[in-house]
Curated annotation (Swiss-Prot):
It comes from the Eukaryota. PANTHER family: BIOGENESIS OF LYSOSOME-RELATED ORGANELLES COMPLEX 1 SUBUNIT 3. This is Biogenesis of lysosome-related organelles complex 1 subunit 3. InterPro entries: BLOC-1_complex_su-3. Signal peptide: none annotated. The gene is Blos3. Residues 1-48 are annotated as: Disordered. Residues 31-40 have a biased composition (Acidic residues). Component of the biogenesis of lysosome-related organelles complex-1 (BLOC-1) composed of Blos1, Blos2, Blos3, Blos4, Dysb, Muted, Pldn and Snapin. Component of the biogenesis of lysosome-related organelles complex-1 (BLOC-1) involved in pigment granule biogenesis. Keywords: Coiled coil. One of its GO terms (cellular component) is BLOC-1 complex. Residues 102-133 form a coiled coil.
Length: 144
């Protein structure tokens, strides 16, 4: 029990376990009261010492457990918060990249549709040119 708690008096194991023995003469034929009282006092004092020590230990144990639980909770909360923040930053970055990619794909799709329309128009004009007569039909009569 070497731990000291601030605000409480220091106790040593020796102070709690020291007993002062008093020696007295016994009268023969009389029952010794000392033995009975000692047994009662021993039980009472050891119970008091044990209960005081157990209260002190339990109190100290409770404090240490609460402090450790708070420390664990804080570190777990900090870890979770940092993990969530870094994951959310990565998600935001990925989302921005996806938006840029989507915009690029939409622009490419629009450009491809315009190119397809232009190619179709060109094909129609080429077909018109090939099928039409450039020169009018000239009929030449033979002179006889």
């Amino acid at each position: 029990m070497a731990d000291l708690v601030s605000g409480e008096a220091s106790e040593s194991d020796e102070e709690l376990q020291e007993k002062n023995k008093i020696f007295a003469a016994e009268i023969s034929g009389e029952a010794s009261e000392e033995d009975d009282e000692d047994i009662y006092e021993q039980g009472r004092s050891s119970n008091q010492v044990n209960s005081t020590a157990s209260i002190y230990r339990n109190n100290l144990l409770q404090r240490k457990l609460i402090e450790n639980n708070i420390a664990i909770w804080r570190s777990l909360t900090a870890f979770t918060r940092s993990f969530v923040l870094s994951a959310s930053k990565q998600l935001v970055t990925t989302d921005q990249m996806l938006i840029k990619s989507q915009h690029s794909l939409q622009s490419a799709h629009t450009s491809l549709q315009q190119a397809q329309k232009n190619a179709q128009d060109l094909q129609n004009r080429v077909a018109d040119v090939i099928t039409s007569n450039f020169l009018p039909h000239i009929s030449i009569q033979k002179a006889t």
